[in-house]
A protein has these predicted regions:
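RNA pseudouridine synthases
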Residues: 1-282
């Protein structure tokens, strides 16, 4: 939705005129989520004074790009998206164009889109990018200091004996790109909290929290616990009823590098998971 300002007016007043049933709290949330733009730039406050001729844009709650990427949030510092499965997060030696990072750069017409973390090609869900060097450094520091909270859901083979707990090991990748636990001297510390939220005789649905962010960490920890993620052939899964790896990045919480406000984004579980587990009850 777009409209042109015909006379000088406060942003809050013009929004109340167009959305009389929306509270001030709701309108403020639109500001914080990057839904309101003034002449193509993100509005910073409800109290800003608008001048005649300026253009105000109210964006939808999210934008779905042609490739199936759902843009949940976008401003001058960060982009938060929901990545579909079977899409590379960033460029590799074998693929540079058909990646989430490059598609965002092209589709959103961004000069810079910096990766601050990754999801495996087979994993769907929440992912975040930085739009400038300052934001990139801030977010990378938050990751390094374990200030960012990431929650995943995974369907795994078998039922866990222990309902909840913590997996901890040192991981190392070999020359064939296979990651496994190793000795303290040779590996990097990886810590995963797990909670079994549903199970039957064949499968279990786990809520997983990354306390560290090592390559293939969740896949390795589940597999080495005797419960490989459904569809994860690389780490010894025997079944693939969903025809995809059943790992989903569900939520992400971080401190906005400019606004200095804690933000949380959620990507609901894929409906395909419901073929095995009753995800609607979560």
């Amino acid at each position: 939705m777009k409209f042109i300002i015909v006379q000088n007016i406060c942003l809050q007043d013009i929004l109340k005129k167009h959305f009389p049933k929306s509270s001030k709290t709701t309108l403020r949330s639109w500001i914080h989520s990057g839904r309101i733009l003034i002449d193509g730039r993100y509005a910073a406050d409800l109290g800003v004074e608008l001048q005649q001729g300026q253009c105000v844009t109210i964006r939808d709650k999210f934008v779905i790009l042609a490739e199936g990427i759902k843009v949940l949030y976008e401003d001058d510092a960060v982009i938060v998206v929901e990545k579909p499965e079977e899409m590379l997060s960033v460029a590799t030696d074998f693929e540079t164009q058909n990646t989430l990072q490059n598609i965002l750069k092209v589709r959103l017409r961004r000069k810079n889109v910096f990766a601050v973390h990754r999801l495996d090609r087979e994993t769907s869900g929440i992912m975040m990018f930085a739009c400038n060097e300052s934001a990139k450094q801030s977010l990378k520091t938050q990751f390094e200091e374990r200030q960012i909270q990431k929650t995943y859901y995974a369907l795994v083979e078998g039922k866990l004996v222990t309902q909840q707990g913590c997996w901890q090991s040192y991981l190392k990748e070999d020359e064939k790109y296979f990651v496994r636990s190793t000795s303290v001297e040779n590996g990097k510390l990886a810590i995963t909290e797990f909670n079994q939220v549903w199970s039957n005789k064949q499968f279990a649905l786990l809520r997983l929290k990354l306390l560290t962010g090592k390559k293939n960490q969740l896949r390795v920890h589940c597999s080495e616990a005797g419960h490989p993620i459904v569809g994860d052939k690389k780490y010894r899964a025997n079944s693939n009823p969903l025809r995809r790896m059943a790992l989903h990045a569900y939520s992400l919480t971080f401190l906005h590098p400019v606004k200095q406000k804690k933000m949380t984004f959620v990507a609901p579980l894929p409906t395909s998971f419901d073929k095995i587990a009753p995800i609607k009850t979560l």
